[in-house]
Swiss-Prot record:
Residues reported in the UniProt entry to bind Mg(2+): 53, 164
PANTHER family: NH 3 /GLUTAMINE-DEPENDENT NAD + SYNTHETASE, NH(3)-DEPENDENT NAD(+) SYNTHETASE
Identification of the protein by name: NH(3)-dependent NAD(+) synthetase
EC number(s) stated in the UniProt entry for this protein: 6.3.1.5
Binding site for deamido-NAD(+): 139, 172, 179, 259-260
GO biological process: NAD biosynthetic process
Catalysis: reaction(s): deamido-NAD(+) + NH4(+) + ATP = AMP + diphosphate + NAD(+) + H(+)
Complexes and interactors: Homodimer.
Encoding gene, per UniProt annotation: nadE
InterPro entries with a match to the protein in the record: NAD/GMP_synthase (IPR022310), NAD_synthase (IPR003694), NH(3)-dep_NAD(+)_synth (IPR022926), Rossmann-like_a/b/a_fold (IPR014729)
Amino acid sequence: MTNLQDIVVNEMKVKKHIDSEQESREIIQFIKSYVQSHSFIKSLVLGISGGQDSTLTGKLAQLAVEELRNEGRDCQFIAVKLPYGVQKDAEEVEDALNFIHPDEIITVNIKPAVDQSVKSLNEAGIELTDFQRGNEKARERMKVQFSIASNRSGIVIGTDHSAENITGFYTKYGDGAADIAPIFGLNKRQGRQLLKYLNAPKHLYEKVPTADLEDDKPQLPDEEALGVTYDQIDDYLEGKHISSEARDTIENHYVKNAHKRELAYTRYTWPKN
């Protein structure tokens, strides 16, 4: 490993091997512990996209609130469908929800809000690129989740995991924003492993990962956007040797997007001071 890989592996907390039952139990217990430590929490809120990460996080959250209720705590899991108009993979969203069995499902079409925001910016002389409009969608989705959480005395659960965190492959204050991130510490293949253990439908964890935020590049695979495969990222996170080209790509993403992993800097926390 390179010196930087040593640092990253330690920071991202990915184990070389996991026991599915133990790892699931630890994540469920973390969610329960957080709720038990905050008396105001009566709901957990999460947007469900039909992809691996939200399906796994949603299932574990639902299992956690069911245990909490059995222990006498009033708490529910709210799954949120957040389409931008008509969602191309809407059937997979429904399949994920059928697997999760959330206590409540709320649907909010973000298209009117996003389109109006883009229009207002354009009228002010700010013409967003397609990529920037994609970030608008991600931030609107998170805004909606926090609004629901506020209304229902809840918190927002994030789907950030270590294979995503290392590359910064999320929108700052969009899908990167949340109160807790239960599946951090897992890489992509470990997330699939847990979904298999939880008996998720195979097509949900074998689905090609995509953020699907850009209108000009619908369903763009994550790996194409990143220039590196998840297997390579996972190997890197497990401390394995990978090609120098893949290593450089991953480390460039890590360094470039360091700001996404930090809260707003102050003059006391900025390392250059």
